[in-house]
């Protein structure tokens, strides 16, 4: 089942850099979207709250390597920036 919201369209405003970097962020964003959809039935990133992204980082990625967590963390930051919740995200990470 493919998530219905288009992550490429959602992240277009914040994606910068080389083509390979943009593709990595898009692939990871789609995996984040699928995990959140499976857990909370929310496929539209505009409906996500910070708790959903926090769960992904702290819960879903707990068994992944530090390298993977780092790169997924960069993608999560892009999503947070696109949602306009950077200030709240910084407060949650303290």
Please provide the spans of the model-predicted regions.
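Short terminal alpha-helical segments
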Residues: 1-18
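Non-catalytic DNA-binding core/recognition domains of DNA-processing enzymes
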Residues: 15-90
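Short, intrinsically disordered, charge-balanced linker/junction segments flanking boundaries
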Residues: 92-94
């Amino acid at each position: 089942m493919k998530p219905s919201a288009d992550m490429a369209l959602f992240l277009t405003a914040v994606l910068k850099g080389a083509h390979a970097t943009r593709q990595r962020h898009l692939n990871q964003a789609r995996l984040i979207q699928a995990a959140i959809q499976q857990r909370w039935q929310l496929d539209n990133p505009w409906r996500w709250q910070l708790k959903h992204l926090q769960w992904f980082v702290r819960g879903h990625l707990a068994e992944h390597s530090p390298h993977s967590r780092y790169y997924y963390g960069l993608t999560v930051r892009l999503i947070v920036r696109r949602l306009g919740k950077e200030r709240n995200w910084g407060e949650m990470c303290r």
